[in-house]
Amino acid sequence: MIRTLLRLVPAEKRGAVAGYAVLTLLSVLLRAVGAVLLIPLLAALFSDTPSDAWLWLGWLTAVTLAGWVTDTNTARLGFDLGFAVLSRTQHDMADRLPNVAMSWFTPDNTATARQAIAATGPELAGLVVNLLTPLIGAALLPAAIGVALLFVSVPLGLAALAGVAVLFGALALSGRLSRAADKVAGETNSAFTERIIEFARTQQALRAARRVEPARSQVGSALAAQHGAGLRLLTMQIPGQVLFSLAGQVALIGFAGMAVWLTVRGQLGVPEAIALIVVLVRYLEPFAAIADLAPALETTRATLNRIQAVLDAPTLPAGRRRLDRTGAAPSIEFDDVRFSYGDEVVLDGVSFTLRPGNTTAIVGPSGSGKTTILSLIAGLQQPASGRVLLDGVDVTTLDPEARRAAVSVVFQHPYLFDGTLRDNVLVGDPEADPDDVTAAMRLARVDELLDRLPDGDATVVGEGGTALSGGERQRVSIARALLKPAPVLLVDEATSALDNANEAAVVDALTADPRPRTRVIVAHRLASIRHADRVLFVEAGRVVEDGAIDELLAAGGRFAQFWAQQQAASEWAIGSTAR
């Protein structure tokens, strides 16, 4: 855990870490010395010259004051380090996530990222002071007391150090017993959280399927798994706690027994023996503190591991190049591109060149690789081999900001943020001129929606755009994409779930866009591609036909068959007679 935490400390604060370590060690030594000073203090107080106790009291007072000053400075430095870790972690995760390879975002990793982001709050800022400082103090103080006791009585000091070894051995063993179960419990907790979120978001479908009872859904399975993991965790923790408690009793008996033996033999006076009772309490207190900190320690270790997992997530290749013709519609070239999802080959040697400013439609059956082509152009994925070029520049060598600025995307399932309709359009270009925003909304026919909405473009659309219909959300996403001054526009199945009116609105918006762009449209419904200059028909990861719509229809190949199937499907209606 400490190694992970040190990796999160900013470079400019590494010197402060050394200062913090020195102050923490000094604090431990001062507390150990203060505890052991009670022995000569009481010995002097019960001696023939009790006035000698003033000297030892003075030393005890000085050590106590020095400890207060040290602890105050340690706390200040600890908070400074904690806030530095918090700030760096927040910035690093914010910088990392937009560049992480999309293949990393599995359900488990997505849950890890969500929990890591949620953890970057006040608890991370207070980690050093509230957990690390007490933990280091509790771990070192018994050993420091044992070393200090060597100067009073070597056998007593050795007994104390032996007790430290026994207690830390028991603590390590109990931690090992529970760590594996704790990992499983953490995984099942994450899975249960994801299922609860899924259960809440899919209520409409679940109610329609009469599966609203959690026990009949995957929530029930996740809950059962969480319950079982929790029981296993408790089962593994109890033996560890018993073992640690027994070790504490052994250390107590060993230390107290040594003190009694030395007193009986006359090697230790009665006043010193009485003082040792107080020292014994100070000796055992840290172990109780460690036991109390153990759950927080495991939780913090898991949190830091999640944060580190996000920061270690694989990122897309990034270069420093930029497009030479900024703002001009670029050419797009695929040069023998291959891509796979695991063992499944999606694109197998795809090559083509799209002319600047043209509109190209990519058509083909489901699973043929159409959306993957768009992802590669957008830089969301990287080819396993081959190259994707914009104006002759390999996408992988582009600066990440230049790559993102070059492409605007309309997704099949658009996501709107919990803000106003206008705010969601402005995501495309937050600094856009108001006239440009109005023009983009007019092109996407968002202006037709404003009269029906309670607050016009100031209407709050809700998380995910739940206040709008699917077609309305798609229009807003089109306006957002058109507002972005990107020279490449990618459209992925934007009309697949829309009615005829909304489909016409989307197609008209894409056609009427006056900005010079190279457009690539993926579509199943062929009405969406009627204005395309060129069609690529993709099947089984290969481009099997390439040409203008009329040429491909006349050729009578796969595109013509696909077109005929679409035409037949569009004419089907309930009550149609089979021929």
UniProtKB/Swiss-Prot annotation:
> Family per UniProt?
Belongs to the ABC transporter superfamily. Siderophore-Fe(3+) uptake transporter (SIUT) (TC 3.A.1.21) family.
Q: What is its main location?
A: membrane
Source organism: Mycolicibacterium thermoresistibile (strain ATCC 19527 / DSM 44167 / CIP 105390 / JCM 6362 / NCTC 10409 / 316)
Which residues belong to any copy of the ABC transporter domain? 332-565
Q: Which protein are we looking at? A: Mycobactin import ATP-binding/permease protein IrtB
Annotated ABC transmembrane type-1 domain ranges read: 21-299
Positions in the Periplasmic compartment: 47-48, 263-272
Subcellular locations according to the entry: Cell inner membrane
